[in-house]
Design a protein with these regions (language model features):
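A generic secondary-structure signal for well-formed alpha-helical elements
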Residues: 61, 68, 96-99, 137, ...
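Short, polar/flexible loop-turn hinges at active-site or ligand-entry regions and domain interfaces
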Residues: 49-50, 139-143, 222
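Short helix-capping/linker segments at secondary-structure and domain boundaries
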Residues: 98-102, 134-141, 240-248, 278
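Short catalytic-loop micro-motif centered on adjacent basic/acidic residues
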Residues: 75-78, 141, 219
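Internal, conserved structured core segments that host functional sites
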Residues: 106-160, 164
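Conserved nucleotide- and phosphate/pyrophosphate-binding catalytic cores
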Residues: 148, 154-319
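N-terminal Rossmann-like or analogous alpha/beta NTP/dinucleotide-binding catalytic cores
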Residues: 2-130, 282
Length: 319
């Protein structure tokens, strides 16, 4: 089963990114043919700062590798290192009705949030379709807000296949209903947009500050506490097995500990869980040439597949 996912280099990763998506990708490496790329072309729709994009791309590569992405098990590359995706993007554009793109929810949402209404943003789903179809992707893991983009890729693929024969594999969106929705420090869904994150690779000082900002109720220290509705508990249980969760629940129900104690405990859990990943992340960032070698290794494998696919398409077009 060939699975593909693209990840934008949009800044620091938080534990919501990890438990909501990255952990599932790492686990999937053992049973699927994983294709993962850092979507730096896509990131240009929100920022055209070249130096920032370059640094964020390297940080993203270091982050994913340190969290368990294995370049020997997965094909892992930088989107812009496989130029064929832009060639396919242009070909697919000829098969994409304007009305199909005008119905895209994400375009309207992003413009409403202040992003410039550029052609790049408008045609974002066509580039995403090129990412998917270039590699004969079967499964695309997505959040519910991205299902429509995979459906657009299918629509375009069907149109091309009707014209030229079975050129493209029809992809399917996979929404994992069991994926954790991680609450942020304010109790809403954890998101950079809400400024309520607990970042994985932040300094210990910043981590402590973020955890200290978790919103709690005013229950007195000596009184029993409601673990089910406590944001600290909701986050802590992600790091605990069943027995660990039960032990923490008992501490809540017993009373005698304040929320400050539970925040300190959560701080210890997060630090311990990501200790090795942080060390590896910092080591990788100190060796940008090594990071580039890893990305080049993946790009070479991805490019070979992409070139074979494009050769078939060139023959159909007459190029």
């Amino acid at each position: 089963m060939r699975v593909l996912t693209g990840l934008q280099p949009s800044g620091d990763l938080h534990i919501g990114n990890y438990f909501g998506a990255i952990k599932q990708m790492v686990d999937a490496q053992e049973k699927s043919q994983m294709f993962m790329f850092i979507a730096n072309y896509h990131a240009m729709t929100s920022s055209q700062d070249g130096e920032k994009l370059k640094q964020n791309s390297l940080k993203a590569a270091a982050a994913f590798l340190s969290l368990g992405i294995d370049p020997q098990k997965s094909v892992f590359w930088l989107q812009s290192d496989v130029k064929e995706v832009m060639e396919l993007y242009w070909v697919l554009s000829q098969f994409t009705p304007m009305g199909l793109l005008e119905r895209a929810h994400s375009y309207k949402d992003k413009v409403a949030k202040g992003l410039s209404a550029s052609h790049g943003l408008f045609s974002y789903p066509v580039l995403m379709a090129a990412d998917i179809l270039l590699f004969d992707t079967q499964i695309v893991p997505v959040g519910k807000d991205q299902i429509q983009h995979v459906e657009i890729a299918r629509d375009i693929a069907l149109k091309v296949n009707n014209e030229w024969g079975e050129i493209f594999t029809l992809p399917e969106a996979k929404v994992n209903e069991e994926v954790a929705v991680v609450v942020g420090t304010d109790g809403a869904k954890m998101s950079k947009s809400y400024q309520n994150t607990i970042d994985i690779f932040s300094s210990e000082k910043t981590l402590k500050k973020q955890i200290s900002s978790i919103v709690t109720d005013s229950t007195a220290l000596e009184d029993p506490k409601d673990h089910e509705n406590c944001n600290i508990f909701k986050i802590a249980k992600l790091f605990l097995d069943e027995s660990g969760q039960k032990e923490l629940q008992i501490r809540y129900e017993k009373g005698g500990e304040g929320y400050g104690h539970f925040k300190m405990y959560l701080n210890e859990l997060v630090n311990a869980y990501f200790k090795e990943a942080r060390e590896k992340y910092n080591e990788l960032l100190e060796k940008p040439s090594h990071l580039k070698e890893i990305l080049d290794f993946g790009a070479t494998k991805a490019r070979k597949i992409a070139q074979e696919k494009m050769q078939k398409i060139y023959e159909k077009i007459g190029l």
